[in-house]
């Protein structure tokens, strides 16, 4: 069972500023609590690949983002991950469920 409050506390401890991704049924509870949270901004994308490009830009702008996607979405995001985060050497943390 997903315990959103514990995950959010861990994100705060790591000073995560943004959570970028595509909500799904498994992450719904976490997204709902993040939307009510005032220290972490939620940025939704229509595809998982967009999340890596957007999170990379946020990092370059001084933010500390986390990518939150479902496991099948990571396959869709492969080229975007390689083309931005990996090739540019951007240290992004991903929570893939």
Residue ranges and their predicted role:
Residues 1-97:
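Thiamine diphosphate
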């Amino acid at each position: 069972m997903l315990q959103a409050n514990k995950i959010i506390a861990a994100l705060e401890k790591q000073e995560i500023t943004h959570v970028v991704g595509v909500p799904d049924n498994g992450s719904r509870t976490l997204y709902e609590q993040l939307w009510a949270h005032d220290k972490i901004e939620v940025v939704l994308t229509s595809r998982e690949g967009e999340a890596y490009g957007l999170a990379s830009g946020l990092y370059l702008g001084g933010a500390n983002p986390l990518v939150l996607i479902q496991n099948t979405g990571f396959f869709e995001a492969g080229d975007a991950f390689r083309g931005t985060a990996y090739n540019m050497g951007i240290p992004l943390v991903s929570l893939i469920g």
